[in-house]
Amino acid sequence: MSSVFRKILVTCALPYANGSIHIGHMLEHIQADIWVRYHRMRGHEVWFVSADDAHGTAIMLKAQDLEISPNKLIKNIRIEHQIDFSNFKISHDNYYSTHSLENLYLSRKIFTCLNEKGLIKEKKIFQLYDTVKKIFLPDRFIKGTCPICKSKNQYGDNCEICSATYEPTDLINPISVISGKKPILKNTKHLYFDLPSFTNMLKKWIHSGVLEESVIKKTEEWFKVGLKSWAISRDAPYFGFKIPNYPNKYFYVWLDAPIGYISAFKNLCFKSKKLNFNELWNQNSNYELYHFIGKDIIYFHTLFWPAILEAVSFRQPSGIFVHGHLTMNGLKLSKSRGALIKASDWIQYFDSDSLRYYYASKLSNKTHDIEINLEDFIQKINSDIVNKLVNLAARNASFINKYFNGYLSDKLSNIKLYKYFVNTSSSIEDFFENREFSFIVKESMRLLDVANQYINEKKPWKIKRTEENIRELQNICTMGINLFRIIMIFLKPIVPDLAIKTESFLISKLTWDGIKKPLLSHQINKFFPLYKRIDVEKMFEFMNICR
């Protein structure tokens, strides 16, 4: 166990409940899950929650298209999402929904608090209205040219190219996504949260160590142009929570969605007797709170969300970890853009560890985009996992099983080399803590090269099976098995399925404390295939369904 015991809550951004989980969603959940699994291995108390973002016009319209109720739609989608996350071994303690009694209660309670403090203002505005569908258009149902960078085909709330936020009415040449027609401006009233009054607090908070430097710079750009009051209401028809005392007004999804982090934890408290809701969310909490998000929602999490928490005297996040977009052939994979690879399709062709490992090999604590290339993917999995990692175990286990009835020696053939591997754990720990997962993969592969080189130099297959030499053979192969074991301990949070198979093969749990304690005079199982090589033909089959 790590020397200082920590209590941690981790969240991922909430997938929208109008469609399938794609491998872009999975990037974030895998990143968070690796971090969570590592800290659990170190003996910390770690809770991991997320939820479906289950409100909005898009859900209402999707349900209408399917001729089912919105409630039925979000129920079906949540089940599908839970299956997808389970297939990729995402270890949520609670995967909830924003359409819940807890979220209704907390959204109304927080709104009432904001209103009583004079932080909610009602304004008359002009809003884009679809005369064909007779509906006020939400941000994501309007496309046009970004008023800042002039990029075309951008949504009505923020630009995916320059990350600017703006009002839908600021778009140049707006078009309704629903009808394809140009909307008109229509008068309505909306409720606004007084975000500008938190400018000084937010300027101080973003420099408190919670954000990576590039995220700070991005956030500072919004201070330069000045923060604007934030609309938190939407007009009927809408699927969501009604705002008390405001007929035909509903909470905007960006109010009740982040509150979903809190409600998912509140629901978890009902399920677990170990947890106390107020212990985590009070301003003096000794829990750590981390949000994993994509760079397209930085504004909401570094400005709007901390201002809301400050206003209602809830604790602030300890860190907001931002990743880049997932791209293929240079294009962002996005459900809203209609360019995606569904997680359920992926798992029909490849196992979950393969994607987890591939993502880990590219992930850092920076916001750079991650390019997925299927040829590179197959080469990396077959080379790293099959040829290097599993082969190290196989070539040593064959001798241990054949000549020693599965028993490892009572000594290692090279104590100095074993200690060298053990000493690398300190840098691996730093890499995990700082989410530099690509460095963990690189270091593990470097160690594998060292281990395989050691076995190649010793050439156990050439050692004569005499009474004099048989002991040396056992010591060498015991050394090889133990070096494999250390590397698998390092990789356990990344490839949990392979870790389970390895534990079965070794008849020993892979624990962080076990790094310093080699397996000696210990019987292992007969070796069995731990990982299957990926067939190139599978890649071509998969590429066909992705077109």
From Swiss-Prot:
CDD domains: Anticodon_Ia_Met (cd07957). The keyword Nucleus does not apply. Keywords: Aminoacyl-tRNA synthetase, ATP-binding, Cytoplasm, Ligase, Metal-binding, Nucleotide-binding, Protein biosynthesis, Zinc. Binds 1 zinc ion per subunit. GO terms for cellular component: cytosol. One of its GO terms (biological process) is methionyl-tRNA aminoacylation. It comes from the Bacteria. Pfam families: tRNA-synt_1g. Its EC number is 6.1.1.10. The keyword Transmembrane helix does not apply. GO terms for molecular function: ATP binding; metal ion binding; methionine-tRNA ligase activity. A motif ('KMSKS' region) lies at residues 332-336. Zn(2+) binds at C146, C149, C159, C162. PANTHER family: METHIONINE--TRNA LIGASE, METHIONINE--TRNA LIGASE, CYTOPLASMIC. Is required not only for elongation of protein synthesis but also for the initiation of all mRNA translation through initiator tRNA(fMet) aminoacylation. This is Methionine--tRNA ligase. It comes from Buchnera aphidicola subsp. Acyrthosiphon pisum (strain APS) (Acyrthosiphon pisum symbiotic bacterium). The lineage of its organism: Bacteria, Pseudomonadati, Pseudomonadota, Gammaproteobacteria, Enterobacterales. The gene is metG.
